[in-house]
Amino acid sequence: MPAYNIVVFAGDHWGPEVTAEAIKVLRVIEKSRDDITLNLQDHLLGGASIDATANPLTDEALAAAKNADAVLLGAIGGPKWGTGAVRPEQGLLNVRKEMGTFGNLRPCNFAAPSLVEHSPLKASVCEGVDFNIIRELTGGIYFGDRKKMTAAATMDTEPYSRAEIERITPRAHLALQHNPPLPVWSLDKANVLATSRLWRKTVTEIMAKEFPQLKIEHQLIDSAAMIMVKNPRQLNGIIVTSNLFGDIISDEASVIPGSLGLLPSASLSGIPDGKGRVNGIYEPIHGSAPDIAGKGIVNPVAAILSVAMMMQYSFGRFDEARAIEAAVRNVLESGVRTGDIGGKATTSEVGDAVAAELEKLLK
């Protein structure tokens, strides 16, 4: 019987509220399946860790995360720690670096069909949107040299190596998990930037060599940003892009489903091809929202769907992943929702409903 070790970083403010509901789902899976054991370890990260230890990430917590099979994260940060020399985000950046999570995966779709009415886009524009953004996390301008040249001028540099691009591109293999395979989009600014020309050249060569059966299309980032508002279904499939462009385009995509409380993400340390262990950090894309924490009104769906991603990418448990998604869909369609998507249910009521529905689906 496989035993999976999961480190839980509940984090700050409403982080513990949403991870509590995600853990309910994990417990249902363990109860309903004889061939899986889940060992959960609670550790502090971010502001909670600063308050307890004066350190946003202790050596003990880091070691546990690196040795785990997966990490479940709630949310970190808040104005309480925002201007200090020691900040919550330092802990998160450190754990990502030490775990080697060089790629981030963010899906953009509707967890339930009726949620289309909550999108800021017209239903005729956004209905059927379903793409995944794969963002390179460890290269580019965020990790380049910074220089203050004069009092009125500064400079940031964007370095990218072929090796970094070669490492992220094979994640497009996720397109092969569908029949027929999904199209793959690579976003860059090759008409202006030298790094983007290297990006396009490398992506083209890697895709032709390793995935000749997949269709790859190149799109300029500014054009893609326009398409995402005008006709986002055109981008359905797998989107691969650099750190800066991925940061911006994934935030643009996040508004399509209508609430940040609906969208999960995964930062992975390898290629989830079933050939080896792939640790990852699974978390909702929203922040810690101190203004509504503790009121029982936050949406736990993104945290619950992060567990579905964990089941699929770190554990290779596709049936359980699809069951979680179906449970969420059924509960939302039944009208059990938090206020951000037109309902009146509390955080725990949504979590309880999803757990109960999942238990029925797994019988």
From Swiss-Prot:
EC code: 1.1.1.85
GO biological-process terms attached to the record: L-leucine biosynthetic process
SMART domains for the chain: Iso_dh
Binding site for substrate: R96, R106, R135, D222
Cofactor binding, per record: Binds 1 Mg(2+) or Mn(2+) ion per subunit.
A cellular-component GO term for this protein: cytosol
Cofactor: Mg(2+); Mn(2+)
NCBIfam families linked: leuB (TIGR00169)
Subunit field text: Homodimer.
UniProt similarity note: Belongs to the isocitrate and isopropylmalate dehydrogenases family.
Protein name: 3-isopropylmalate dehydrogenase A
Annotated source species: Aspergillus niger
